[in-house]
Structure formats: structure tokens, C-alpha cells
């Protein structure tokens, strides 16, 4: 089974994806590294720009039928069996991205994306099997246990469990000023 771990930057994708792969004894695949290795991604400043259709082709050709956890912001756009959309309180995302040195504009974009469910909506538009998991106030290990429990119970769709509309006032500073 191919499992995509996706979400807004700062939700904990890489940590959770690595732990989940280990727990399930699946291969861990960083989409950025995979794209660079296959020649369908290139470094631009601090980011990797990816040709999505080419990347999907290589995923289909080289990973379909294998057990792997795909880690990356674009993993929900790949041909996978299950998409896990990680969510986190927008204020927490703003704080994490500020600690990573993101500029104000990038922090604002990502906080807004989390606020309006951007990644979740894209995932639902692309796939039938989508599970949403709120990582706020949970350890990565607890998040992995929740994902494994959902998979083992046969749940293939669980969305709509997160609603950040009530915290809008808390995150206005991140939208306007990058958290300052």
C-alpha cells in the first residue's frame, strides 16, 4: 500500500512519515529526494520545484504495488492508496515556520492555507481514501498510533474533523505580520 503523508509545512509530515514507515515496516520515501533523484525536481533557492506529472509517473512506475510511505507537501497529488492529511493549529504552524526562518509572507501563506483547509480540499478532490488527523497537542508517536488504528479498523475516509474558524482572531498576527 502506498500511503501519502501530506499537510501544510510545519504540521510534522517528515517526523510522522518516518515513524509510520518504521512502525509498518514500509519504505520511507521523501518526495523531494525522489524527485531530485529521478530528474523531475530541481533546487531553486531553499525549495525543490517539481514537475508533478513526471513525479507521478515515476511513483506509478517504481513504487506502485510496494509498501511505502510518501512524505511531502505534494504527496496527495500522487497515485497512492491512502492520503493522510496532517493538520495543526495555525498559530502552532506560524511559530514553527518562524523558528525555521521562513519570511513573513511565506508564514502568512502557510497559516492561511491551514486555516482554509487548502491541502485537505486538494486531497479530497484527488482521492477517495483520505484521512484527516489533527496533530495539535499530540506527540508524533500518538499521531502514528492514531493513523495505524484508523488503518487497522478499515477506515478509508475521515475528513471534516478540524475547524479553525473559531481561532481566526488568534492567528490574525500570523496572517498580517508573520507572527510578530
Swiss-Prot record:
Region (LID): 99-109
Quaternary state and interactors: Interacts with uS11. Not a structural component of 40S pre-ribosomes, but transiently interacts with them by binding to uS11.
InterPro entries xrefs: Adenyl_kinase_AK6, P-loop_NTPase
Keyword Chaperone: no
Entry protein name: Putative adenylate kinase
Gene Ontology BP, a term: ribosomal small subunit biogenesis
HAMAP family per the UniProt record, alphabetical: Adenylate_kinase_AK6
Family indicated by similarity: Belongs to the adenylate kinase family. AK6 subfamily.
Pfam families named in the record: AAA_18 (PF13238)
EC number(s) given by UniProt: 2.7.4.3
Role description: Broad-specificity nucleoside monophosphate (NMP) kinase that catalyzes the reversible transfer of the terminal phosphate group between nucleoside triphosphates and monophosphates. Also has ATPase activity. Involved in the late maturation steps of the 30S ribosomal particles, specifically 16S rRNA maturation. While NMP activity is not required for ribosome maturation, ATPase activity is. Associates transiently with small ribosomal subunit protein uS11. ATP hydrolysis breaks the interaction with uS11.
Organism expressing this protein natively: Pyrococcus horikoshii (strain ATCC 700860 / DSM 12428 / JCM 9974 / NBRC 100139 / OT-3)
Amino acid at each position: 500500500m502506498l500511503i501519502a503523508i501530506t499537510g501544510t509545512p510545519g504540521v510534522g509530515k517528515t517526523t510522522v512519515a518516518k515513524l509510520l514507515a518504521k512502525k509498518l515496516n514500509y519504505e520511507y520515501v521523501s518526495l523531494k529526494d525522489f524527485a531530485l533523484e529521478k530528474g523531475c525536481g530541481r533546487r531553486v533557492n531553499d525549495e525543490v520545484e517539481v514537475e508533478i506529472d513526471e513525479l507521478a509517473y515515476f511513483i506509478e512506475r517504481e513504487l506502485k504495488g510496494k509498501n511505502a510511505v510518501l512524505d511531502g507537501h505534494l504527496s496527495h497529488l500522487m497515485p497512492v492508496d491512502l492520503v493522510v492529511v496532517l493538520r495543526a493549529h495555525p498559530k502552532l504552524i506560524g511559530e514553527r515556520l518562524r523558528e525555521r526562518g521562513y519570511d513573513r509572507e511565506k508564514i502568512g501563506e502557510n497559516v492561511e492555507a491551514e486555516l482554509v483547509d487548502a491541502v485537505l480540499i486538494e486531497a479530497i478532490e484527488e482521492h477517495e481514501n483520505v484521512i484527516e488527523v489533527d496533530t495539535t497537542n499530540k506527540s508524533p508517536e500518538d499521531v502514528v498510533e492514531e493513523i495505524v488504528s484508523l488503518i487497522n479498523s478499515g477506515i478509508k475516509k475521515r475528513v471534516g474533523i478540524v475547524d479553525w474558524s473559531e481561532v481566526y482572531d488568534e492567528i490574525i498576527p500570523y496572517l498580517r505580520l508573520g507572527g510578530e
